[in-house]
């Protein structure tokens, strides 16, 4: 079972990835 911290970090990483993709596009 993932801890809340791990889940938050995963979500943040995904959001940053999307932001980077949009900036580079």
UniProtKB/Swiss-Prot annotation:
The keyword tRNA processing is annotated on this UniProt entry: no
Function of the protein: Carrier of the growing fatty acid chain in fatty acid biosynthesis.
Pathway this chain belongs to: Lipid metabolism; fatty acid biosynthesis
Family from the record: Belongs to the acyl carrier protein (ACP) family.
Cellular component terms (Gene Ontology): cytoplasm
Domain Carrier: 2-25
Alphabetized UniProt keyword annotations: Cytoplasm, Fatty acid biosynthesis, Fatty acid metabolism, Lipid biosynthesis, Lipid metabolism, Phosphopantetheine
Protein name, per record: Acyl carrier protein
Subcellular locations according to the entry: Cytoplasm
Free-text description of this protein's post-translational modifications in UniProt: 4'-phosphopantetheine is transferred from CoA to a specific serine of apo-ACP by AcpS. This modification is essential for activity because fatty acids are bound in thioester linkage to the sulfhydryl of the prosthetic group.
Record-linked InterPro entries: PP-bd_ACP
Keyword Chloroplast: no
Domain of life: Bacteria
Gene Ontology biological process terms from the UniProt entry: fatty acid biosynthetic process
């Amino acid at each position: 079972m993932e801890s809340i911290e791990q889940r938050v970090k995963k979500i943040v990483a995904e959001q940053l990835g999307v932001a980077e993709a949009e900036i580079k596009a």
